[in-house]
């Protein structure tokens, strides 16, 4: 095992929360440190969404690479911004489904 486990940031639409949880579980059992989107059971305000979006970019900064959970190839607006940010910062990006 390397000195430090790989760190992967999961990105994806909140409509795929179950799939992101499964990816988190699988990566964790594979010895990977996973940084995932925050979750809320209730509706959030626009202000909270803006804050969470900014926080997720910082999570991407912490990661060695990004895994986009995109069943059926779906990538929404927020996820597209995260992919562009990850690309601009030189992160390796992989997808669960073809885009």
PLM features per residue range, with description:
Residues 1-99:
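Conserved catalytic or regulatory cores that recognize and/or transform ribose-phosphate-containing ligands
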């Amino acid at each position: 095992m390397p000195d430090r486990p790989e760190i992967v940031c999961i990105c994806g639409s909140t409509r795929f929360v179950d799939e992101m949880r499964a990816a988190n579980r699988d990566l964790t059992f594979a010895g990977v440190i996973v940084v995932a989107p925050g979750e809320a059971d209730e509706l959030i305000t626009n202000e909270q969404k803006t804050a969470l979006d900014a926080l997720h970019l910082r999570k991407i900064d912490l990661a060695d690479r990004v895994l986009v959970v995109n069943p059926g190839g779906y990538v929404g607006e927020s996820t597209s911004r995260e992919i562009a940010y990850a690309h601009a910062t030189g992160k390796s990006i992989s997808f669960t489904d073809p885009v």
